[in-house]
């Protein structure tokens, strides 16, 4: 099935068709598990088989990535660590973890830290997905949920701390 047909499928149909591809890679997921993820990736999928590489992090407890990916563009490991610590605090303080309510405080933090959005959001993206390229950040974080994002931020902080020494 090519990207034209993928883009024109409804969410439930596409979620159902993606389950076998996830199963082939060892992920025990249902169409209901895939349903909230489909809108995040549907426009980006060229083939159904790409689903695993684009969404595996939603179903993994431990992310395996190189700590160097956490170092922001034109930043040191120590700077990235300090900024990720501040971001973790800001995320923990959010009363609700919805994408539309997350974006403004995160952009305010970017300005407060004197960074470009791509610098901070790149660090956060790697921390929560283990990837430099992933579905839209705030939507992804909403699907993952606050507790999983904070746990992943904590692990990323540990990884960055080992680099910053």
Regions found by a protein language model. Give the residues of each.
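Short His/Asp/Glu-rich catalytic/ion-coordination signatures at enzyme active sites or charged loops
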Residues: 1-8, 69-71, 133-140
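Non-catalytic terminal extensions that flank enzyme cores
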Residues: 1-25, 107, 143, 147-165
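Short, hydrophobic/amphipathic alpha-helical patches that form generic packing surfaces
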Residues: 1-4, 43-46, 123-127
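Generic, ordered loop/turn and secondary-structure boundary motif
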Residues: 5-7, 49, 58-60, 129, ...
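Small-residue-rich helix-loop
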Residues: 10-113
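Charged substrate- and nucleic-acid-binding regions of tRNA-handling and nucleotidyl-transfer enzymes
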Residues: 99-161
